[in-house]
């Protein structure tokens, strides 16, 4: 039995399988997940697990090179954006229109669906390398 880090087997596996520039999406409970993209559904009820809790644990396990948010988060969910940006600890951060964000999610290795029930609480995390 694994005793540290992410215990969810599919999520732990996806992170372990990432190569440089592969990416995953951490999503609120409303983001559409494209057909053919692996869905790791963590949602138990609205708000559980929270986007920020999930992001914190993923960042502890994953080597992140950069992140992308939808432009709309700045206006509609600045508290989540600020907290998530702080967690990313100086990593380059980009913003794209929400429609483009949804298009980008089609190329994700997986979309991790949280129970977050607040607008635009979604981020794309690009894998870096550990050397």
From Swiss-Prot:
Pathway: Carbohydrate metabolism; D-ribose degradation; D-ribose 5-phosphate from beta-D-ribopyranose: step 1/2. It is found in: Cytoplasm. GO terms for molecular function: D-ribose pyranase activity; intramolecular lyase activity; monosaccharide binding. It catalyses: beta-D-ribopyranose = beta-D-ribofuranose. Substrate binds at residues 28, 98, 120-122. Its main location: cytoplasm. Keywords: Carbohydrate metabolism, Cytoplasm, Isomerase. It is an enzyme of class 5 (isomerase). GO terms for cellular component: cytosol. GO terms for biological process: D-ribose catabolic process. Its EC number is 5.4.99.62. The active site is at 20 (proton donor). InterPro entries: D-ribose_pyranase (IPR023064), RbsD-like_sf (IPR023750), RbsD_FucU (IPR007721). The keyword Cytoplasm applies. It holds the Pfam family RbsD_FucU. NCBIfam families: PRK11797.1 (NF008761). Homodecamer. Catalyzes the interconversion of beta-pyran and beta-furan forms of D-ribose. Belongs to the RbsD / FucU family. RbsD subfamily. This is D-ribose pyranase. It comes from Laribacter hongkongensis (strain HLHK9).
């Amino acid at each position: 039995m694994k005793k540290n880090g992410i215990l969810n087997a599919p999520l732990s596996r996806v992170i372990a399988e990432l190569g440089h520039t592969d990416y995953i999406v951490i999503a609120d409970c409303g983001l559409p997940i494209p057909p053919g993209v692996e869905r790791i559904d963590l949602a138990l009820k609205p708000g559980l697990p929270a986007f920020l809790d999930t992001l914190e644990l993923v960042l502890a396990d994953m080597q992140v090179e950069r992140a992308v948010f939808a432009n709309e988060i700045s206006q509609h969910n600045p508290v989540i954006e600020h907290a998530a940006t702080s967690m990313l600890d100086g990593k380059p951060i980009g913003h794209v229109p929400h429609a483009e964000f949804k298009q980008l999610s089609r190329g994700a290795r997986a979309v991790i669906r949280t129970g977050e029930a607040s607008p635009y609480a979604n981020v794309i995390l690009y894998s870096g390398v550990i050397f």
